[in-house]
Design a protein with these regions (language model features):
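Nucleotide-state-sensitive switch-loop elements of NTP-binding domains
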Residues: 3-17, 22, 26-119, 123-130
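C-terminal helix of von Willebrand factor
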Residues: 77-81, 163, 186-190
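Phosphate/Mg2+-binding loops and adjacent switch elements
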Residues: 92-179, 184
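Conserved small/polar residues in nucleotide/adenosyl-binding loops
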Residues: 192-194
Length: 194
């Protein structure tokens, strides 16, 4: 029997990582409401931590998003994911992962049949990045490893950004690295001259 190895998964999983207050919720609140991200079916949003920003469940329902919360790392199990799959029958899953949990533990899990990680995105608060890198480097490395997009926000000081890019590229050469300040995306060409 021939198996189509290029078959797209039935349920695409988007894994969002980043430390607390790195902008995960803000990014997802924006993205989930955009026309380009809309699908016909249901999106299951799994929250693994509560940050400063919150989701409005009624607002999210307008975009076909249902929210489930996992309080403790021990509760995020293969069985729980199966239960959520049966309960919601999602077309897409977005996981806002807890920044203090090892991402590798989730990546080792057997996902429900038809689910596959489509994209891993990491958000970083540039104003606290150096502190996290110094004190929690192994967790940061896990977050960034295999990420397709690393988004640095709150980039008010442009001087260290080229070094931040190098820190990411060492771990995840394929990652697209984007820097944003309060006005939006920082011109990457300007970083070359810093």
């Amino acid at each position: 029997m021939e198996i189509d190895m290029m078959k797209e998964p039935d349920v695409m999983v988007y894994l969002m990582t980043g430390f607390l207050d790195s902008g995960k919720t803000q990014f997802l609140n924006f993205t989930l409401s955009q026309d380009y991200f809309q699908i016909d079916g249901k999106t299951l949003l799994i929250l693994c931590e509560e940050g400063e920003e919150e989701y409005d469940p009624m607002e999210m329902l307008k975009y076909g998003v249902v929210i489930e919360t996992v309080e403790d790392k021990e509760d995020l199990t293969e069985e729980w994911l199966e239960e959520m799959n049966k309960k919601h029958e999602p077309e897409r899953v977005v996981i806002e992962y807890n920044g203090m949990w090892q991402v590798s533990e989730f990546e080792k899990m057997k996902l429900p049949a038809g689910w596959a990680i489509e994209q891993k995105i990491t958000t970083v608060d540039a104003s606290t990045f150096q502190m996290y890198l110094t004190n929690l480097k192994p967790l940061f490395v896990e977050m960034v490893k295999g990420a397709e997009l690393v988004l640095f926000n709150r980039c008010e000081d442009k001087k260290p950004l080229a070094g931040y890019r190098r820190s990411v590229k060492v771990v995840s050469p394929q990652a697209e690295v984007i820097f944003e300040d309060e006005n939006g995306e920082v011109d990457n060409l300007s970083l070359i001259h810093i």
